[in-house]
Amino acid sequence: MGNDQIAAAWLDEGACRFAEYLYQKTYCTDLDFDGYGTLEDWFQTQYCMITGQKKDGQQYAEDKTDLDWSLYDWQKDDPMGYSEIYYKGGSLFYEMEQRMGEEKFRQALREYVRTFAYGTVDTEQFRQFWLGKGDFSKLFALYWK
């Protein structure tokens, strides 16, 4: 399964960062990035940035990462900000897992891979697939505002 890496870079970068989280959660439970926390911590912080909530008593800067931007948009307007799609995309997968539960999410993730295997998926197909698995409309509205 692939995607348009220029037009929807967040899809593969976010999925890869989420896959790193799954690996870390399974095999590296004591890893904390030299005091910077786990990927789960980073995903939770990203969600707080998106929603304006505090985490551990701290207020974080508002998230302005636009998942609809292409690589050309990032290059033109904010080359250094591109790296944020890794965490925002990964955080979206993480939040969907939290809402569905680990087992249901993994079953749906397997179906997602089977559905789009040997083809490509775009942001709208991603949204439609996952809206068929749960009520993510409010979550998606947060991530694409």
Each model region followed by its residue ranges:
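Short, mixed-charge aromatic SLiMs
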Residues: Q44-K55, V113-T123
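Extended hydrophobic/Leu-rich segments
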Residues: F43, Y60-A61, M96, F136
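Flexible, active-site-adjacent loop/turn segments at secondary-structure boundaries
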Residues: D4, A8-A9, E13, T65-W69, ...
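Amphipathic alpha-helical substructures
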Residues: L31-F33, D73-Q75, G81-K145
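A short secondary-structure junction motif
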Residues: T26, G57-Y60, E103, F116
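Zinc-dependent metallopeptidase catalytic helix centered on the HExxH motif
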Residues: M1-M49
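The feature captures the short pre-catalytic strand/loop hairpin that immediately precedes
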Residues: Q58-P79
